[in-house]
Amino acid sequence: MAEPELEELAELVRRLSVVHGRVTLSSGKEADYYVDLRRATLHHRASALIGRLMRELTSDWDYAVVGGLTLGADPVATAIMHAPGRPIDAFVVRKSAKTHGLQRLIEGSEVAGKRVLVVEDTSTTGNSALTAVRAVQQAGGQVLGVATVVDRATGAAEAIEAEGLPYRSVLGLADLGLG
């Protein structure tokens, strides 16, 4: 990956998103820091870097649509969609289907019959990504792999690879001075 852009993104994530202190993660585990990546994924410069670096990271996967479980994946998917390069559309997987309107679980671009990249902002256990993977597969999409901006090195890679899917991340804990 482009080293200057990777370093710039790591610095932005360190400055904007890393919060030190005891926190409970979505997995229920406790940690001494939290990576609130929405502070970076919704930042004008960091978002542009995320889009370009995620496209570069997954450039050998020929996907047509990108998305994941709301809320963390939403700005990552739109950053990829808007990054320079070939047209890629985006979708959002709801945590539960709507009970009104069209009652959809997946919003945005159709995934049925398409090659799909599932994304996350920060991966801990991989459960959020795997929830999105299953929703896409049930809707008829072909998931090519999972990519995340920050991997916490706490089991996500192993869980996703155990499902037969490749897993990649732009940044790890060492990049953020946490490893």
Swiss-Prot record:
Keyword presence, Magnesium: yes
Binding site for 5-phospho-alpha-D-ribose 1-diphosphate: 94-95, 98, 100, 120-128
Record keywords, A-Z: Glycosyltransferase, Magnesium, Pyrimidine biosynthesis, Transferase
Domain of life: Bacteria
Residue ranges of the TM segments: none
Binding site for orotate: 124, 152
Cofactor: Mg(2+)
Keyword Glycosyltransferase listed: yes
EC numbers on record: 2.4.2.10
Ranges in a coiled coil: none
Pathway connected to this protein: Pyrimidine metabolism; UMP biosynthesis via de novo pathway; UMP from orotate: step 1/2
GO biological process: 'de novo' UMP biosynthetic process; pyrimidine nucleobase biosynthetic process
Gene Ontology molecular function: magnesium ion binding; orotate phosphoribosyltransferase activity
Catalytic activity: orotidine 5'-phosphate + diphosphate = orotate + 5-phospho-alpha-D-ribose 1-diphosphate
Its biological purpose: Catalyzes the transfer of a ribosyl phosphate group from 5-phosphoribose 1-diphosphate to orotate, leading to the formation of orotidine monophosphate (OMP).
Subunit annotation: Homodimer.
Family classification: Belongs to the purine/pyrimidine phosphoribosyltransferase family. PyrE subfamily.
Annotated protein name in UniProt: Orotate phosphoribosyltransferase
Organism the protein comes from: Mycobacterium avium (strain 104)
